Amino acid sequence: EIRFCDWSSDVCSSDLSPRTDWLTDPAEASGYIVLGMGKYGARELNYSSDIDLIVFFDPEKARPTGGLDPSTFFVRITRDLVKLMTERTPEGYVFRTDLRLRPDPGATQIALSVDAALQYYETVGQNWERAAYIKARAVAGDIAAGEAFLRELSPYIWRKYLDYAAIADIHAMKRQIHAHKGHARIAIEGHNLKLGRGGIREIEFFVQTQQLIAGGRQSDLRVPETLTALDRLEARGWISPPTAAEMAEAYPFLRSIEHRLQMLDDEQTHSLPSRPEKFEQIARFSGYENGAALAKAVRQRLETVQTHYAALFEDVPALSRSAAPGSLVFTGDSDDPETVKTLAEMGFSSPSSVIGKIGRAHV
């Protein structure tokens, strides 16, 4: 993994120092907090990954001189930082960067004050946001302030008791995953290893759901890494040794195939090829004699994951076909046309608004 934390601090320093005389070392006790989320936070990045960041600031720690508003200043710094990472040059780019996991991204600035963030999470924070913070870590800027923020947020993430509404919300997250287009069955050619049935997201949700339920009372379950969490869930008796072993074997297997898919054409993809010649190519690249051998290995893992995942939610009703007659996809940078159509058929007058609000649940 690229030493983004050190690099980002250097960028912040070089960007801030020429503009101000109020802070000599912006990477030290500046109150500027950059949290890494998702696979970046858990040190589980793909070969071709976006990185998910949330940026906060503590105005009490860093007060710009000259009457400059702290919010304006830190928004500007964040915008410049993201531009440096995402801008394509002859040498390429550093990372595609996504800031949309912050509180209410459609209505808030890209850098929020710590107080505003805490108030949001304490009053209207959602369970999907609690799940997202399982993998959060301070990665740049004022690391000590970032770690202090996560400690303060800990009671929100790790509740000692879950009420029925919270558990129902977790079940709703599961149903939404199953509503994803292409999730109805296991298909090999064209199967999405991340979002499809038996895929990577099911393993991660299998783990995170049980962490949310038990982590408030058992602090050793509060770990960001998927494989470490599986080990600890087994040790605590939440899952059986065979289940832990099979899920722990399937996760790196599926991730390794995902990496190779992204290496093949240097693009961000999670789906196995539909064309036979491309499938043979990825099979050989993955160390298999032919496509049939790879297909057999992939199907075995997908079916294993599907079995364990379904057992965890065996009493959860499926999303009603009458309520959702078509596709429901809430990921991606643009609205899925089939999802817009489905929501319109369900009676929503503004499908794009609905997609924007629900899309933050996919982390």
Each language-model region and where it sits:
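Conserved catalytic core of two-metal-ion nucleotidyltransferases
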Residues: 12-35, 64-123
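Long, hydrophobic, amphipathic alpha-helical segments used as structural scaffolds
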Residues: 9, 14-17, 85, 89-93, ...
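Core structural elements
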Residues: 31-32, 37-40, 161-236, 248-262, ...
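Polyanionic (Asp/Glu-rich) segments that form extended negatively charged tracts
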Residues: 60-62, 125-128, 205, 227, ...
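A glycine-rich phosphate-binding loop feature that marks nucleotide/adenosyl-phosphate handling sites
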Residues: 17-32, 94-110, 172-175, 194-198, ...
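Single conserved hydrophobic/aromatic residue that forms the stacking wall/gate
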Residues: 1-12, 361
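Long, amphipathic alpha-helical stalk/connector segments used for oligomerization, subunit docking
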Residues: 103-109, 114-200, 213, 302
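Catalytic metal-binding acidic patch
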Residues: 33-35, 40-68, 203
